[in-house]
Amino acid sequence: MFIDSVKITLASGDGGKGAVSFRREKHVPLGGPDGGDGGNGGDIIFICDNNTHTLVNFKGKRELRAQNGAGGMGRNKNGKKGENLELVVPEGTQVIDAQTNEILLDLTKEGQRELFLKGGKGGLGNTHFKHATNQRPDYAQPGIKGESRLVRLELKLIADVGLVGFPNVGKSTLISVVSNAKPEIANYEFTTLTPKLGLVDVDEYNSFVMTDIPGIIQGASGGKGLGLAFLKHIERTSFLLFVLDPMREMLLKEQFIVLRKELEKFSDELFGRKFGIMISKSDSVNLGEEFAEQIALNINELENYLKEINNPQSFLIKVSSLEKTGLKELKFMLLEEIKALRNNK
């Protein structure tokens, strides 16, 4: 199950209370204080692990608490520190204050370890309060309460290339043939119901990560279809690949215009991201001469429109995932763009 957003209360452990205790030995009837300190409460720690892919482990949990520190004991024995609660999350997880929407943590690197809530300090035992005028103090400190915070965990997948397109245009087929991802593929819309990540090996030394999200429909930025819930997953991609389908009723030019508008409505930053254009199902020209002519006109209209707006795309390529034509060229084009973006960081 793909879970990418949860609301939960997190609390660090309370400090243990200090002990009130006095030495009790056979020949020492009025022994001095020997109360130990309380242990510190456990901390809440986030750990970023790329073997974890969703927030499903947090599903249905309203609160998670670290262990309280143990109380102090006699004979100056300090209480044990409460166990830390280590929360393992996928790369791309943000910890957000549920009330203010402030981003408190941004976990983006494998192995990243962040202290989120510090456990409460243990109270001092009565040993600490002995002085000249009070040789037998009968009080100790209570432990300090741990911290508590209502947060929202949001997962934004991190990938180099994000696929953008309408439902059933060939995005899932593409990612299945160029990467190790195995999405469900069928001839109906919204086959992809959750984001998919795939590692694309270009050659022996170079690879990049591609993500496929559920198809965007007109109005996705306003909440229609599945697009809005998952558009955030391409916010962290370095490069966008628009996948346009010449078999759709909507012309290629119109597909491109609508998709760009939806991105612009969702995020100015996403709209300004570098992108390429892939025309999928290029094998469809084999369906007959008349059909091939229609597709050629369709592509020509798109190319003319792109010229009018000064060719904002990095490249335009025709690909057939079925016949595996254009795939090698596409992978090298994407790698070139990603390398350039990495070098400019």
Swiss-Prot record:
In this chain the OBG-type G domain maps to: 159-339
What molecular functions are annotated in GO for this chain?
GTP binding; GTPase activity; magnesium ion binding
Predominant subcellular localization, coarse grouping: cytoplasm
Looking up Pfam families in the UniProt record yields: GTP1_OBG (PF01018), MMR_HSR1 (PF01926)
Q: Which cofactor does it need?
A: Mg(2+)
Q: Which residues bind Mg(2+)?
A: 172, 192
CDD domains in UniProt: Obg
Instruction: Kindly list the GO CC terms recorded for this protein.
Output: cytoplasm
Entry keywords, A to Z: Cytoplasm, GTP-binding, Hydrolase, Magnesium, Metal-binding, Nucleotide-binding
Query: Any idea where the Obg domain is?
Result: 1-158
Can the keyword NADP be found in this entry's annotation? no
Q: What SUPFAM superfamilies has UniProt attached to this entry?
A: Obg GTP-binding protein N-terminal domain, P-loop containing nucleoside triphosphate hydrolases
- Sites where the protein binds GTP: 165-172, 190-194, 212-215, 280-283, 320-322
The UniProt record lists the EC number as 3.6.5.-
What biological processes does GO assign it? ribosome biogenesis
Q: Which domain of life is it from?
A: Bacteria
Q: What does this protein do?
A: An essential GTPase which binds GTP, GDP and possibly (p)ppGpp with moderate affinity, with high nucleotide exchange rates and a fairly low GTP hydrolysis rate. Plays a role in control of the cell cycle, stress response, ribosome biogenesis and in those bacteria that undergo differentiation, in morphogenesis control.
Entry's family note: Belongs to the TRAFAC class OBG-HflX-like GTPase superfamily. OBG GTPase family.
Q: How does it assemble?
A: Monomer.
For this protein, the record's NCBIfam families field holds:
Obg_CgtA, PRK12297.1, PRK12299.1
Protein name per its UniProtKB record = GTPase Obg
The organism's taxonomy opens as: Bacteria, Pseudomonadati, Campylobacterota, Epsilonproteobacteria, Campylobacterales
- What gene makes this protein? obg
